[in-house]
């Protein structure tokens, strides 16, 4: 199976960012790591090997970006507004850097996203907010309510990153 390591300076995060990719063509699937996980977690836990036949056949190409959870939601040394701000920077890095790279590498116009645990939150939140870029969502045991990370702080950025709050109020043509 073709495996590539990527590292670049993310303009959205203003720091180095790492990612592993597996495969050479096929539906691009972005796999988010769990809360404390890194970009190599899906490989280390056997998730990539579980779909190796699809990767080798060119049906799937897997993209495993790093996370910034310890700089955002799990960074209890900063104010909750800074946590959500860092999360938004991460989301923008995924949208503008990772997804665009995945589309370029595969020729697909949209990507699939997946994740377990807090990776499930990232997958679902980005899929719900950006159906123009994402056509499949696979999530398992996601932690979707961010209120436990913001300790009573609540503003528009929190609202628009908390699916249990914004999803019931959607009424536009995207949904």
Where are these regions (language model features)?
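Non-catalytic cap/lid and distal C-terminal segments of serine-dependent acyl enzymes
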Residues: 1-175
